[in-house]
């Protein structure tokens, strides 16, 4: 879904409901599905994150895709998912609207002889929620494929910590 409304008439009230975990919102994100027998090792090789253990539905990471000079090309939220129409385990990369096609082309151009395919999934939409609204979202949205959970401030495999403070305000965020 490339378009998400900015608000529904009362942005301050809507923000308060979101912050309280009483509402959810459609997010303006493109979804790129990466599938095939080699996707785990392939994405670990071409990204900044270790994804070889991302085998179970719902496991998630934040990942960057860099150019040859180390500049960020794409930032994505990666979540393992069993996509209903294909029936196979894959990873969904959630990127900013308008970036999906470019990321899919980049991933397909770097696959060489590996059994992996990246494709934009315009039929999949992204919604965001905090706290109790995650359960409400699951009850409202038909054909919910998976949820992405922000692992921060925890340490993911292959990651490191840079935060020693109190609980992060986005700890209950799901997309």
Show where each model-derived region lies.
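Basic, glycine/lysine-rich polyanion-binding surfaces/domains
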Residues: 1-175
